[in-house]
Every structure is written in structure tokens, then in C-alpha cells.
């Protein structure tokens, strides 16, 4: 099984550390990769941890689709609201996990009903 973790950041703090910890916890059991905005500082950390990573200039359905075609994940694990929406637009039949790390600042101006994510199914 292959899992692609998707984040929208150029830093290595909360959600980024969680994604890296999940990847390391499943090392040798599940093939996982990390995708986020390009950032040499983050890449250096991930390289030091032995984590495969993909960088995108901007996270859009087109750029994420390119990574998906290259990596060919069985599951996509999106780590915030923005990445969840972008991933939902391009994941097709690939199961999507939407992991919201309580970063409510991403939700400003959005009004979502509880059922909004039901459309994408459950993993």
C-alpha cells in the first residue's frame, strides 16, 4: 500500500511533524511519501529522516495530479482544509483522508455543513 501525505506549508511544525511521525511509524510496513510546497529547510529535515518527498511550487489540482501520477498512491492523506479541497478535486477514485489539525485560520470565510465531506466517502 502507498499513502501520499499532502500539506500546504513551507514550515516544519505541528501538522508537518505529525505527518512525518506517521510516515516513520509505518516505515517498512506501508510505503508513504510527503508532498508540500517546495522548501529546502523542510526537505533537509525529511532527507535526514529518510522520508521521500515531493515539492510543488503551488498546491493546485494540476500540480497535485502530477504528483499523484508519479507516485501512484493507494490512499491520499490531506493534512488541512485547503489540501483536503485540492485533493478532493483530483483524487478520483483514490480514497481520501481529510485530517484537520485544528487550524481554523484556514476556514475563514468558509461555511461548511457537516455533510460537506460525506460526498468523498470514508476510509
Across the structure, where does each feature detected by a protein language model lie?
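Membrane-interface segments of envelope glycosyltransferases acting on lipid-linked substrates or membrane lipids
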Residues: 1-123
Amino acid at each position: 500500500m502507498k499513502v501520499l501525505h499532502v500539506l500546504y506549508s513551507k514550515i516544519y511544525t505541528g501538522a508537518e511533524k505529525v505527518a512525518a511521525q506517521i510516515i516513520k511509524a509505518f516505515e517498512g510496513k506501508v510505503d508513504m511519501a510527503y508532498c508540500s510546497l517546495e522548501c529546502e529547510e523542510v526537505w533537509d529535515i525529511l532527507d535526514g529522516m529518510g522520508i521521500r518527498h515531493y515539492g510543488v511550487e503551488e498546491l493546485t489540482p494540476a500540480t497535485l495530479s502530477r504528483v499523484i501520477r508519479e507516485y501512484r498512491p493507494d490512499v491520499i492523506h490531506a493534512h488541512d482544509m485547503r489540501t483536503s479541497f485540492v485533493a478532493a478535486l483530483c483524487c478520483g477514485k483514490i480514497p481520501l483522508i481529510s485530517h484537520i489539525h485544528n487550524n481554523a485560520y484556514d476556514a475563514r470565510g468558509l461555511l461548511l455543513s457537516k455533510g460537506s465531506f460525506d460526498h468523498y466517502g470514508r476510509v
